[in-house]
């Protein structure tokens, strides 16, 4: 995540566990319009106080920004949210970055699903503790189309 982001950019974060919260905070501190959503309501109050927009549904959240970052426990959890018809439709033509943990086979399956639905997709992994998110010490791995990564690199 770079401090040299376009201040007019918008990002959505799905999943507000420790890592999702750290990501949303870093996006806010970088000056990005940040929309947040979590399966458990009410986990976003402190982020809203910092300037985040609370979405009432995952569909509303992904429709709010051209870039959605999902960070939940695993692909079963991300699939339960992303593969709902309304959410899948809202993601069409947008970029999805999945930072949830799972197997390479699940990553490939999700990339294929995204492609079938017109969703631009990057898979990722966080290789750092939440306390380093937003600093030069944070380490992320991303895979997918290089041009898509380059497009979003200033934010990621």
What do these predicted ranges mean?
Residues 1-63, 67-70, 94:
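NAD(P)+-binding Rossmann beta1-loop-alpha1 motif at the extreme N-terminus of oxidoreductases
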Residues 24-26, 48, 80-83, 108-112, ...:
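Short amphipathic alpha-helical segments
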Residues 43-45, 78, 131-134:
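A short acidic, helix-capping loop that chelates divalent metal ions and anchors anionic groups
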Residues 49-55, 78-81, 122-124:
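Short gly/ser/thr-rich secondary-structure transition/capping motifs
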Residues 59-71, 75-120:
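Rossmann-fold NAD(P) dinucleotide-binding segment
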Residues 101-156:
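Rossmann-fold dinucleotide-binding core
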């Amino acid at each position: 995540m770079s401090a040299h982001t376009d201040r007019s950019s918008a990002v959505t974060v799905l999943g507000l566990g420790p890592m999702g919260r750290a990501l949303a905070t870093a996006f806010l501190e970088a000056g990005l319009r940040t929309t947040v959503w979590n399966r458990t309501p009410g986990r976003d109050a402190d982020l809203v106080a910092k300037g985040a927009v609370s979405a009432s549904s995952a569909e509303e959240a992904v429709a709010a920004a051209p870039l959605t970052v999902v960070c939940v426990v695993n692909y079963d959890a991300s699939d339960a949210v992303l593969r709902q018809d309304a959410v899948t439709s809202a993601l069409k033509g947008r970029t999805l970055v999945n930072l949830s943990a799972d197997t390479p086979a699940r990553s490939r399956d999700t990339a294929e699903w995204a492609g079938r639905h017109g969703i631009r997709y990057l898979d990722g992994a966080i290789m750092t503790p939440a306390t380093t998110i937003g600093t030069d010490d944070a380490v992320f791995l991303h895979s997918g189309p290089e041009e898509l990564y380059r497009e979003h690199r200033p934010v990621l």
